[in-house]
């Protein structure tokens, strides 16, 4: 996996860095991209979900609860690594805080939309009440339309007999 070096190495403990990535005299570890071996990158990395012939829902339910990555380990035991790790950790905490605020706003917004939709539906029902009183309930109209359709189908099949059954369906 090729990456921009320091981002992955900043999350690794110094002992987990492979020998080719350790600083050599005259070369900076952060100056070049490097291939990093697979393994945990941060202190709060989650394990992989179980794989197999399980349906996706059960795979999701077996997955451990999400932990937010707000703490990054220093790549080495020097001031620069500690400062970079602290900066990235602070950024992660701010991001987590903003994410929680956005989730709360989204929840309130969705709730307000649902309340607005409910009040709009009740206002529409109230405004439509005189029309329903004049024309009758929608269920009665639906039954009448179905009876007319059935009569038309029977009339198309047997024109003489269809008229006898139509009067039985009226209400």
Swiss-Prot record:
Transmembrane segments: none annotated. Pfam families: PE. InterPro entries: PE-PGRS_N. The keyword Secreted applies. A motif (BH3-like 1) lies at residues 73-78. This is PE family protein PE6. Essential virulence factor involved in regulating host-pathogen interactions by regulating multiple host cell functions. Interacts with host TLR4 receptor at the macrophage cell surface and promotes activation of the canonical NF-kappa-B signaling pathway to stimulate secretion of the proinflammatory cytokines TNF-alpha, IL-12 and IL-6. Strongly induces apoptosis by inducing pro-apoptotic factors and efficiently activating the reticulum endoplasmic stress-mediated UPR pathway. It comes from Mycobacterium tuberculosis (strain ATCC 25618 / H37Rv). Residues 70-126 form the PE domain. Its main location: secreted. Residues 32-65 are annotated as: Disordered. Belongs to the mycobacterial PE family. The lineage of its organism: Bacteria, Bacillati, Actinomycetota, Actinomycetes, Mycobacteriales. Contains 9 predicted calcium-binding residues and 2 typical BH3-like (LXXXXD) motifs. The hydrophobic, disordered C-terminal domain (amino acids 120 to 166) contains a BH3-like motif and has similarities with mitochondria targeting proapoptotic eukaryotic Bcl2 proteins. This C-terminal domain plays an important role in modulating host mitochondrial functions, apoptosis and host-pathogen interactions, but it is not required for mitochondrial localization. GO terms for cellular component: extracellular region; host cell mitochondrion; host cell nucleolus. It is found in: Secreted; Secreted, Cell wall; Host nucleus; Host nucleus, Host nucleolus. The keyword Signal applies. Residues 1-23 form the signal peptide. Interacts with host Toll-like receptor 4 (TLR4). Interacts with host cell nucleolin. A motif (BH3-like 2) lies at residues 134-139. Keywords: Cell wall, Host mitochondrion, Host nucleus, Secreted, Signal, Virulence.
């Amino acid at each position: 996996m090729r990456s921009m070096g320091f981002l992955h190495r900043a999350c690794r403990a110094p002992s987990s860095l492979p020998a080719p990535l350790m600083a050599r005299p005259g070369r900076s570890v952060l100056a070049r991209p490097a291939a990093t071996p697979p393994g945990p990158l941060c202190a709060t990395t989650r394990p992989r979900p179980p794989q197999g012939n399980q349906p996706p829902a059960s795979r999701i339910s077996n997955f451990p609860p999400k932990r937010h990555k707000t703490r990054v380990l220093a790549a080495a035991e020097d001031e620069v690594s500690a400062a970079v790790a602290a900066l990235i950790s602070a950024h992660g905490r701010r991001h987590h805080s903003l994410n929680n605020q956005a989730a709360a706003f989204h929840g309130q917004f969705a709730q307000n939309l649902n309340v607005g939709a409910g009040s709009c539906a009740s206002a529409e029902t109230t405004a439509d009440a005189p029309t329903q009183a004049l024309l009758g309930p929608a269920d009665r109209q639906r039954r009448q339309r179905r009876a007319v359709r059935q009569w038309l189908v029977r009339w198309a099949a047997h024109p003489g007999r269809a008229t006898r059954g139509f009067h039985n369906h009226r209400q």
